[in-house]
Regions:
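Conserved beta-strand/short-helix segments
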Residues: 1-312
């Protein structure tokens, strides 16, 4: 789900109609798990459905609606199972030769009417990269996670063609101008490694982007740990924060939890940035602490109880 003012968007990634576009026939369930999004608006104290939205190239197992983000009159929808081998913005949607490569669809509302504005793919589309597994929209900036992307690049705008780091993950940033959407950055972790899943969760707020790699393995703790290369805490997880000046992105900080341990998956299911505040969930954290700033972070007496960490 995503809420913006009096508008609520709800994803149903396993919905199965073969409709396309906005307001199609919902009753023909011949496209299994193609997915759909429902938009509701509030007037006074009452909610009503405003739109039923499908992909422009509906296909089985696309999971349209698995991720979505609403910002004012703009809605971004991820379909991580979409299968075309197109690249960039506005490519050929009908060539299903890259299974699970994924796509993102942007819709714009004028008055009460929704219409598709853009069809977006990765610049280095690859089968099973799952582009669109996560999306985050802030004004004219869109961040898209592809957690199973395979390149061994690091940092900003590296070489995305060398697929020797399987499922390391990547994030793509797009920006809207008067002429439409275009890719602004291709982002990888500073310590890219196979299986880290960089991009399983993304959150953008203005010129700040937070990216989770829930399967990152380092044994570091806290802010900017210098042990990124020590992979002795499997799936402990990490979050990377990037900032933009003009059109240039750079990594600002590398974050681990203060009590980072194996299988905590810090950031995997939850990361949210708003202004100067960042919240990160770790659903596999095991401490028996309760409330705020418990002093029992090292007591692993409550298996998978989970925790949330706030950074500023």
């Amino acid at each position: 789900m995503s809420l913006s003012g009096d508008t609520l968007a709800v994803g149903a990634p396993y919905e199965s109609s073969n409709a396309t576009g906005v307001g199609g026939d919902q009753t023909n369930n011949t496209s299994t798990s193609s997915g759909a999004v429902y938009v509701f608006t509030r007037s006074g104290g009452s909610w009503a459905q405003q739109a039923y939205i499908k992909a422009s190239n509906t296909g089985p197992a696309a999971a349209f609606g698995h991720s979505l983000s609403l910002s004012g009159d703009t809605l971004a929808v991820g379909a991580y199972g979409e299968a075309s081998n197109a690249t960039g913005v506005g490519g050929n949607q009908n060539n299903s030769m890259a299974t699970g490569s994924g796509a993102v669809y942007v819709f714009l509302r004028t008055g009460t009417v929704w219409a598709q504005q853009a069809y977006i793919k990765a610049s280095n589309t690859g089968a099973n990269d799952q582009f669109g597994y996560s999306v985050s929209l802030s004004g004219d900036t869109l961040a898209v996670g592809a957690p199973l992307e395979d390149s061994n690049a690091t940092g900003i705008d590296g070489n995305g063609a060398n697929n020797t780091a399987t499922d390391s993950g990547a994030v793509y940033v797009f920006r809207r101008s008067y002429s439409g959407w275009s890719q602004e950055a291709y982002i990888k972790a500073s310590n890219t490694e196979a299986g880290d899943g960089f991009g399983y969760n993304v959150s953008v707020s203005g010129d700040t982007l937070a990216v989770a790699a829930g399967y990152e393995d380092s044994n570091g703790q806290g802010v900017n740990s210098n042990t990124q290369a020590d992979n002795s805490e499997s799936a402990s997880g990490a979050v990377y924060v990037f900032t933009r000046i003009g059109t240039v992105w750079r990594q600002q900080v590398y974050l681990k939890s203060s009590n980072s341990q194996r299988d905590d998956q810090f950031g995997y299911y939850g990361v949210s940035v708003s202004g100067d505040t960042l919240a990160v969930g770790a659903h596999g954290e095991d401490s028996s602490g309760t409330g705020v700033n418990s002093n029992t972070q090292g007591d692993n007496g409550a298996f998978n109880s989970g925790a949330v960490y706030i950074f500023r």
